[in-house]
Amino acid sequence: FALLLLAGEETGSFGAKAFRGQHPGAEWVIVGEPTDNCMASASKGTKSFEVEFTGKAFHSGYPEHGTSAVNLFNDFMNALRSIVFPSDDILGNTTWNIGRLSSDNPQNILSPELTCRVYFRTTFESDEMVCNVMKNMAGPQARLRFGRPRVQDGSDIVAKEVAPWQKAM
């Protein structure tokens, strides 16, 4: 049995990684993280992909001679927005966002390079699908940075409503 109070959960889960290194294979762990003051026995998984788009730099006055990595990114985003990920009765909808976007070049030059991070919160139904979609859409440019599979302990309790006095806090 162990108690883990998470540190750095939004920036790399450094506390959880340190814990795992010192306590590999702990049979039972209570994880304390700031999630609405409720108990949960299931949580969404996480998948973070870094995707690089490579264009061809050229002066913006002659765009026909280059390829904008920003336009390639826009095509990718339009395709990703069109995907309907399955909903899950327990964990709800799959959600995603672009957490980091980088393209550093002069404003009058077609961007030769753009990198983004796509962060997914996956469900029982969508965990594997997300990986397949990203592999197919971004091809070899997509690199899985880290991921945590969706978790459920087998109980019927997913989340317990907080007490009224806790809501006031």
Where are these regions (language model features)?
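Acidic/histidine-rich catalytic neighborhood of metal-dependent amide-processing enzymes
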Residues: F1-S48
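Metal-dependent amide/peptide-bond hydrolase catalytic core
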Residues: E9, P34, S41, K47-M169
